[in-house]
Amino acid sequence: MGRKDSSTTKLPVDQYRKQIGKQDYKKTKPILRATKLKAEAKKTAIGIKEVGLMLAAILALLLAFYAFFYLRLSTNIDADLDPDED
């Protein structure tokens, strides 16, 4: 069986690997943060499709109102202009 002290001492190679890992993490941390922010912005941003659909819906609604009032007013005007009513 090994001694208790042997488990607490680390090999120089392991210490070196741990140090390299810390340095690598410090280097990549801003890159990871930027990637995370970009993904979040992409997820919450309004896309071109949504804007196009909203504009199309508003246009269709305006066209429906216009057609309704056009037809409503044009039938009233035609009734007033009938020459056969004399």
Swiss-Prot record:
Print the keywords alphabetically: Endoplasmic reticulum, Membrane, Transmembrane, Transmembrane helix
According to Swiss-Prot or TrEMBL, what is its membrane topology?
Single-pass membrane protein
UniProt KW Membrane keyword = yes
**Which superkingdom, per the lineage?**
Eukaryota
Report the locations given in the UniProt record: Endoplasmic reticulum membrane
Q: Does the keyword Nucleotide-binding apply?
A: no
Which Gene Ontology cellular-component terms appear in the entry? endoplasmic reticulum membrane
Which Pfam families does this chain map to?
A: TRIQK
The residues that cross the membrane are: 51-71
As for what it does, the entry says: May play a role in cell growth and maintenance of cell morphology.
Family, similarity comment: Belongs to the TRIQK family.
Name this polypeptide is given = Triple QxxK/R motif-containing protein
What gene is it encoded by?
A: Triqk
